[in-house]
């Protein structure tokens, strides 16, 4: 990912409150546009970098559960 894109995404949401961040995330997911994926990746990177070990484990469990094959 281009470093300028990462910085642009961070600059675009810096200072946003929780409602604004949620709107950004939900809008990106609901749009279904692949061009939104890098931005979500940057947000996940920030989340991961600021999470405790227990929060990281919880995220990994959630991801694992969400990615299990349908039975």
Curated annotation (Swiss-Prot):
Q: Where in the cell is it found?
A: Spore core
Entry annotated with the keyword Transcription: no
The keyword Coiled coil appears for this protein: no
> What induces the gene encoding this protein?
Expressed only in the forespore compartment of sporulating cells.
Keyword vocabulary terms for this entry: Sporulation
Q: Where on the tree of life does the source sit, at the highest rank?
A: Bacteria
Which family, according to the similarity comment? Belongs to the SspI family.
Q: What is this protein called?
A: Small, acid-soluble spore protein I
Upper lineage is: Bacteria, Bacillati, Bacillota, Bacilli, Bacillales
Give me the gene this protein comes from: sspI
């Amino acid at each position: 990912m281009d470093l300028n894109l990462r910085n642009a995404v961070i600059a675009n949401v810096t200072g946003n409150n929780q409602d604004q961040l949620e709107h950004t995330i939900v809008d990106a997911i609901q749009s279904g546009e692949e061009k939104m994926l890098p931005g979500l990746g940057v947000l996940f990177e920030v989340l991961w970098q600021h999470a405790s070990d227990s929060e990281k484990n919880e995220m990994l469990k959630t991801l694992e559960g969400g990615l299990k094959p349908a039975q």
